[in-house]
Swiss-Prot record:
Pfam families: Swi5. It is found in: Nucleus. The gene is SAE3. GO terms for cellular component: condensed nuclear chromosome; nuclear chromosome; Swi5-Sfr1 complex. The keyword Glycoprotein does not apply. It comes from Saccharomyces cerevisiae (strain ATCC 204508 / S288c) (Baker's yeast). One of its GO terms (biological process) is meiotic DNA recombinase assembly. This is Pachytene arrest protein SAE3.
Amino acid sequence: MNYLETQLNKKQKQIQEYESMNGNLIKMFEQLSKEKKNDETPKKISSTYIKELKEYNELRDAGLRLAQIIADEKQCKIKDVFEEIGYSMKD
């Protein structure tokens, strides 16, 4: 066997290993989905997560705008408004 054939055989074995690993991961995903009674695909789960994250960010931004309005009215920092209502400035 020459060098190219040896390399080709190695690559073919790697491809077979990767295909086997992919099959095992798919089986594991299906098993875990059954255990969790979750029929959603990974794509649907991530799109739901992104949608909820966007909604969270919009609500957080609205809250920050309200806190800024209150701070402007009181002529103080937003930090002072948060401390007054018992929230920390951490996100």
